Amino acid sequence: MPKLVLVRHGQSEWNEKNLFTGWVDVRLSETGQKEAKRAGELLKEAGINVDVLHTSKLSRAIQTANIALDAADQLYVPVKRSWRLNERHYGALQGKDKAQTLEAYGQEKFQIWRRSFDVPPPKIDPKDEYSQVGDRRYADVDPAVVPLTESLALVIDRLLPYWQDEIAGDLLAGKVVLIAAHGNSLRALVKHLDNISDEDIAGLNIPTGIPLVYELDENLKPTKPSYYLDPEAAAAGAAAVAAQGQKK
């Protein structure tokens, strides 16, 4: 039975500062490193032996995977990386404080940019310090597809080919697959797996550093509801994600 484990990277330095991050390559905070270690401990406690790891091209996801697999005594696992697992590109919001953005633009526009399915934020200037145009991480990617902004719908469009071409093959070969990625790339994948509507996906928040397990059939459809390896911590973490950007 194919098994898929999803883990959102631990708290990053910009999560800690409440900044829109997107494709900006920031590292894990000390808290995030502890979360990643706990993720690995949970994998070990659950007896989950990973066969292959898929990550994005962003350091916070790579760090999370490395720390987690180290804690699980599975650092030897083969790794595949793809820009298609990157976080959603937040356009001109990248590097902006979430609370200040909320105050400047109002609740309605803030929520549309942050959580609507198909409305992207304003595009980033290609010459902006937080643009990824010309970034050597993406030297093998057609420059025409390196985004200047994205909605969740656009994330799904660029993620699903990787799911179909790479991840699905590993699962159908009987491998236990770990994906270490980001809040929105994982929301996109969960939407696909659980057939969540465009409207309902706005309410889905994925906590940092807690493995989410899917058991799948031969058609890669869930055989039962997915489950977190620490449900109580996952509920608290999801609530914290939902509250991001609100005034303190």
Swiss-Prot record:
Xref: CDD domains: HP_PGM_like
Pfam families documented for this protein: His_Phos_1
Keyword Cytoplasm on entry: yes
Catalytic activity: (2R)-2-phosphoglycerate = (2R)-3-phosphoglycerate
Pathway as given in its UniProt record: Carbohydrate degradation; glycolysis; pyruvate from D-glyceraldehyde 3-phosphate: step 3/5
Family from the record: Belongs to the phosphoglycerate mutase family. BPG-dependent PGAM subfamily.
Name of the featured protein: Phosphoglycerate mutase
Gene that specifies this protein: GPM1
